[in-house]
Amino acid sequence: MANLKSTEKKTKAQAMGMHTEVLTGRTQQKFFNPDEAENFYYFGTYDVDFNKRTNLDVKDMTAAEANKKIDSLMSEGYGTIVIKNPQGKHSLGVGILNKLNLIFEGSLGYFGMGSCDGPIVRINGRVGWSCAENLMAGKVVIEKNAGSCFGAAIRGGDLICKGSVGARTGIDMKGGTIIIGGDAGAFTGFMMQRGRIIILGDVGINLGDSMYDGTIFIGGQIGSYGSDAVDSELTKSDQDWLKRKLKVAEIGENFDVSKMKKIVAGKKLWNYDNLEPTEKKGAI
């Protein structure tokens, strides 16, 4: 009985995707002193003033030139930068490891806002594939629609699309929250490991396929469930959290979260290599 309880503790996942995994001799948990919060900066980041605002027209710039200019403006202390005429350029706004208010007046191409940590971004248009890939922290809001692989491998922060998104949204995500106001395509949450996905509309086939952990909330119809994705009880705590999150995201006003479906990992794939051949067939 004691061994059973010990095993349960080692595999227990907290609610809403906050997973705690006990590993021999080490832990994935990190502890920081609040008094030292302002000491954690990346090399090459800048102190900026959010009240110091400027416009940047990138119509005749390449993506590399535009990104270098954004960095230069931050070095001058600008904390709010409005990008004019992005015109669907790929890889705009990537690699920003700084606190910053960034506003795009238009649409972005592929890989916009990838590998960022800290900025607050509003895109008044659409985005292509892999928007905000590897986001570490901050907030990215898309006013219209997004392409496939939206929020791939994000580790933190809030990623919000007020329209619909393509396939493989949240693929391999390891934390953070993705919120979709419309519909999502096939394989949403594929190989998801941590974090939460909220979709107010419908979702395509193979939802949560091969997900290891995390939580997916769906407000509409589900095309089909992927391997090891199962329904779970929507608790009062879940509903309260959803209401708060949607309110802060300024999306889904008056949406009835009590009717949402909650999908989690069935955990059959956790020890896949140790299963018998007949059990492996049932797991996938």
What are these regions (language model features)?
Residues K84-P86, G95, E105-S107, G114-S115, ...:
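Feature marks extracellular polysaccharide-active and adherence modules
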Residues A167, M173-D183, R194:
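Glycine- and acidic-residue-rich phosphate-binding/metal-coordinating active-site segment common to enzymes
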Residues K69-T80, S91-L100, F111-P119, S130-M136, ...:
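Beta-strand repeat architectures
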Residues K99-S107, P119-I120, G138, G157-D158, ...:
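Extracellular/lumenal glycan-associated surfaces
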Residues M1-L92, Q193-L200, G204-I284:
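Intrinsically disordered, low-complexity terminal regions
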Residues A146, V165, A184:
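Acidic, glycine-rich active-site loops and adjacent beta-strand->loop/helix elements
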